[in-house]
């Protein structure tokens, strides 16, 4: 007899209902719960799966390179980056009529194509790629790398190559290896690529494998390095009149601290970027030698944590017991990793536009908008995941004995204070921000706009001024030429930085006013409310006054039956589920703000944002409605254009989003009755009744229906805004 899905759970495999399928899918990745799973096998499975993950990433990036080389216009774009639209790939669609074929044939292509809004053209150009051959070689290299990682994953599942549990628990070796090897050496290698290939290429000197060993990246070679005259590498940088990718105005410096942007490309100086990566490399290679492994020297993580006890004794046992708690809990480690990754992803979103690293990216407005939005949404999903695994840690891995009176135990002991403070902050922000917006709406509606409450963000303006923005006239720190801060850096990076921060042609420290003040606090409301829900979910995951034995019910449970009133919706999973809605809400406000602010900046019409962003109708009418009007009338009986595909995506994004509510609002009994009726009809319908199934149809559980609803809500939400963002930006700026 064939074994039924799921193989990993005999209990589920023998379930006579369709629950077998849905619960099987739901628990497929919950390795801990699988039959016969040991701790060692768990670590080995996860370790091997990382190689599979890398293989997928390399295959995907290889595909990007291959399709641009095959179907794109990279070489044409390289010749004129500001006026040629970069092509992602061709479109082969049998549904296209002649108007569609004409509308989508652009960028010098012979047939319909997709325009690239990912920034890969700018990235490849900046790092020294110039021809389709370069792209093909890159694609081939990544394909080989993908094969190698796939093989490595398979290899580490073979008995003789499976690492032991003690190897996985060796925190110091792993830290050294990852700090020095992963971050340090890879940063050093990247510095090498920038200095040997990218910087010469930006100066019109072509370096490839054939001449790699005979072209000196710097006229003086390595002698300044060995004689200690390192300053030589910073002398004679590219001039402000340098034309990128040519020798015109080019210098010879390879490691600089110029500050600001290259005037033509509006991106950071490549020599500054190389210097940054070299500094990071040195820092991490040193950091990777700090922990005690083979030679009995260096730090022990356990000793560091045990030593962290607050003096005076009133603040408990500090970090005592944390080493074993963290080292023995994969959920704790994953929570920390996701929190770090979430923060860095949001920082990437912020820096990709404000300190643009790639040549000509700053002039490609749609790509900037797409990259910002993409990274901000991903950051939101990753951050909510961090709290989810934090909650699972408290349920499955937390040992009260091991953590007596340390920071974790004390967090749990005063959770009421934490949760109520977050609640107070959320309520304060919500009522005051909404109150100001609504007051301003009323004043606009009654024809007295001068009675709006408009608050200048003076503290934020002061911070901008202290970084060198002179517009506000604060004359403080870097915006005051007589300050010590200004004189200390005057001969190095400061002139370039001051030019950049006071220029109106980039997004560094945008001028802010009352509209920014309001939306800043709306975003703060969203962040605090999301955090409140997530923190409450994790801190109440083990139990609460209402349900002291909650941890015995696991991470996700619908209710403890009708006997205990009020136990519905209080599992840690429910908190995660609710928080995702607030997270999406918050990222929505963040991206709305960023996009509208930049649209008006790029159009030279900042007054529109300044005047309309102080009341809600302004946001709805002058941002959402005004910019979606092309999409709402995207295709009609009189024809279509290249925005039609986004208009269609805008529509079906809304439909997916709306489908979510069907699962979120109607509950299990409705679906059970419906399914039983459908099964009855199916079994009595000719032809249809030839198809039979062995599993008795049962409705999704409450938790599963919520997952389905949440998935539709999230996917529809993202699709809708993606279509709106790309269409409204590319429709204006091409």
UniProtKB/Swiss-Prot annotation:
One of its GO terms (cellular component) is chloroplast thylakoid membrane. Belongs to the PsaA/PsaB family. Its main location: plastid. It comes from the Eukaryota. The PsaA/B heterodimer binds the P700 chlorophyll special pair and subsequent electron acceptors. PSI consists of a core antenna complex that captures photons, and an electron transfer chain that converts photonic excitation into a charge separation. The eukaryotic PSI reaction center is composed of at least 11 subunits. InterPro entries: PSI_PsaA/B, PSI_PsaA/B_CS, PSI_PsaA/B_sf, PSI_PsaB. This is Photosystem I P700 chlorophyll a apoprotein A2. P700 is a chlorophyll a/chlorophyll a' dimer, A0 is one or more chlorophyll a, A1 is one or both phylloquinones and FX is a shared 4Fe-4S iron-sulfur center. [4Fe-4S] cluster binds at residues 559, 568. PsaA and PsaB bind P700, the primary electron donor of photosystem I (PSI), as well as the electron acceptors A0, A1 and FX. PSI is a plastocyanin-ferredoxin oxidoreductase, converting photonic excitation into a charge separation, which transfers an electron from the donor P700 chlorophyll pair to the spectroscopically characterized acceptors A0, A1, FX, FA and FB in turn. Oxidized P700 is reduced on the lumenal side of the thylakoid membrane by plastocyanin. It comes from Mesostigma viride. The gene is psaB. Its EC number is 1.97.1.12. Chlorophyll a B1 binds at residue 654. The chain crosses the membrane at residues 46-69, 135-158, 175-199, 273-291, 330-353, 369-395, 417-439, 517-535, 575-596, 643-665, 707-727. Keywords: 4Fe-4S, Chlorophyll, Chloroplast, Chromophore, Electron transport, Iron, Iron-sulfur, Magnesium, Membrane, Metal-binding, Oxidoreductase, Photosynthesis, Photosystem I, Plastid, Thylakoid, Transmembrane, Transmembrane helix, Transport. HAMAP family: PSI_PsaB. It is an enzyme of class 1 (oxidoreductase). Phylloquinone binds at residue 671. The lineage of its organism: Eukaryota, Viridiplantae, Streptophyta, Mesostigmatophyceae, Mesostigmatales. It is a multi-pass membrane protein.
